[in-house]
Amino acid sequence: MKPKYWNKGKSYLSNNDTVLKLIIEKFPDEYLKLNANFYHALLNSIIGQQISVSAASSIKKKFFNLNKNIKPSNVLKLNENILKLCGLSRQKILYIYNISNFFLENKKFIANIDLYDEVIIKEKLINIKGVGNWTIDMFLLFSIGNSNIFPCGDLGFIKAISKLYKKEIPIKEAYLNRLKKRWSPYSSVATWYLWRSLDPIPVSY
């Protein structure tokens, strides 16, 4: 599902950033696809931690083929060795178990999560071992539908800025703040197109 803000964001960024305008024109019909399954979205974020988009895509395909109905109770029944065959590290497997337990123990919160303030969502999710700021950013971006995520802790995001805006890594915080101000309130759109400029397949979680 395309975010409601997407087309407005494209127009806004095209008018305010010549670099992004060229990328947007290169991929005119593509867009960020929201994942309404909050559980799957968080699992996808864990799988995608610190690996390439193509590697994450391969692991996700194997993982979601393990069971026709990937839900917390089913995942907790999966043997660790079976999950390792999908390409998951032991650490990520433990994180997946942690998320599964969280969803089983917090059904009321999950059922109403899109009604909560994002500060509350962050405070709740950060307590899950394995879920950090990057994972929460991906969740807010790809599930909750926040239009203004600026994930400065994402390596691909920083790599794209370095490449497209001719800045050496580490990029100065002052410059990142200028970009954030320029792109606001549509940093999520900018982020997605920066990723798209690097990867042969669109990023999804």
Task: Tell what function each PLM region has.
Residues 1-29, 114, 119-120, 133-142, ...:
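C-terminal accessory module of base-excision DNA glycosylases/AP lyases that mediates lesion recognition
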Residues 42-47, 96-100, 139, 190-194:
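Short alpha-helical scaffolding segments that buttress acidic/His motifs in well-ordered protein cores
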Residues 105, 128, 144-148:
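Histidine/lysine/aspartate-rich catalytic loop segments that bind and position anionic ligands
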Residues 36, 40, 114-117, 128, ...:
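Residue-level marker of regulatory loop/turn positions in helix-turn-helix DNA-binding domains and
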Residues 41-46, 62, 78-82, 120-124, ...:
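A general alpha-helix detector
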Residues 8, 15-61, 65-68:
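A positional/architectural concept
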Residues 16-19, 51-52, 56-127, 182-184:
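Alpha-helical ds-nucleic-acid-binding substructure associated with the helix-hairpin-helix region
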Residues 32-40, 87-91, 180-187:
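Structural motif
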